[in-house]
UniProtKB/Swiss-Prot annotation:
Part of the 30S ribosomal subunit. Contacts proteins S4 and S8. Residues 13-76 form the S5 DRBM domain. Transmembrane segments: none annotated. This is Small ribosomal subunit protein uS5. Disulfide bonds: none annotated. One of its GO terms (cellular component) is small ribosomal subunit. The keyword Ribonucleoprotein applies. The N-terminal domain interacts with the head of the 30S subunit; the C-terminal domain interacts with the body and contacts protein S4. The interaction surface between S4 and S5 is involved in control of translational fidelity. It comes from the Bacteria. With S4 and S12 plays an important role in translational accuracy. Located at the back of the 30S subunit body where it stabilizes the conformation of the head with respect to the body. Belongs to the universal ribosomal protein uS5 family. Keywords: Ribonucleoprotein, Ribosomal protein, RNA-binding, rRNA-binding. GO terms for molecular function: rRNA binding; structural constituent of ribosome.
Length: 168
């Protein structure tokens, strides 16, 4: 029974492979090559997670990354396929800026950031990456920005006002 539920839960997630990289460890006898994989998973409805896996073979690295991504999922409050307000995120040398966009705009984002936004269920957004464009750091900065986004209900609760007063 538990396996069936886990299989169903896994099936409704979108998975995206962002990057595969060959890395090496230098030892006395030469080099030992291995592979790293960066992946994101999401349900297309506000849940998103990223994973980074490392193994001697590419498929094993991808599988490890997918498992880590499923374990590290966060929930993001979305507003009809876009963001509630402009947000900034940063991780090490990478900084990202994202702002809500009107219906029909699409996802204006590059590379790794686009993959995160697609699996999270964001359909209309304007974004820009500053500083380092290392895919790992961009993914982490994007997830950081999305987790710091507040819905009007959260802001209203914090300020002790109603949602209508917050929206103006």
């Amino acid at each position: 029974m538990a396996k069936v539920e886990a299989q169903q839960q896994k099936d409704d997630l979108q998975e995206k492979l962002i990057a595969v990289n060959r890395v090496s460890k230098v030892v006395k006898g030469g080099r030992i090559f291995s592979f790293t994989a960066l992946t994101v998973v999401g349900d297309g409805n506000g849940r998103v997670g990223y994973g980074y896996g490392k193994a001697r073979e590419v498929p094993a690295a991808i599988q490890k990354a997918m498992e880590k991504a499923r374990r590290n999922m966060v929930t993001v409050e979305l507003n009809e396929g876009t963001l509630h307000h402009p947000v900034k995120g940063r991780h090490t040398g990478s900084r990202v800026y994202m702002q809500p966009a009107s219906q029909g705009t699409g996802i204006i984002a590059g590379g790794a950031m686009r993959a995160v936004l697609e699996v999270a269920g964001v359909h209309n957004v304007l974004s820009k990456a500053y500083g380092s464009t290392n895919p790992i750091n961009i993914v982490r900065a994007t997830v950081d920005a999305l987790t710091h986004m507040k819905s009007p209900a959260q802001v209203a609760a914090k300020r002790g006002l109603s949602v209508e007063e917050i929206r103006g």
